């Protein structure tokens, strides 16, 4: 009944087109990550690298729902809240943003940027990781720009310490 509509869908890459031609009903770019409780996301088409945590939402009719980003949003899924804020904090920090900006295409930022970064795996027993996660979550909740800036400064210092960067190194990447 919907074959014609499904066969005329646009926006698929070459390898996806071959699958779609064989299986018109295929759902592509869907995997376990799609249904993760938390997603660390950034815009694919962007001139700057800004990350955020997408968390479950309360809907008055449906109860808890998991937002599903569209194809213009790149994300990493996890079911652990602290891990999501840790990764977002690392990616949001001045040292890592500097690396991403130096590497990224001027108009798009795909998931391949993660391949170029050495991000230590989240360890819930590591107080530094938990501190980065807590600071990032605090920054997400802050509405006052002065508070946001103060949290950003603390986050930058925490990530710099994790990577063994000095204050001078941090000042250099901030400028």
List each model region and its residues:
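Polybasic, glycine- and aromatic-enriched phosphate-binding surface used to engage nucleic acids
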Residues: 1-128
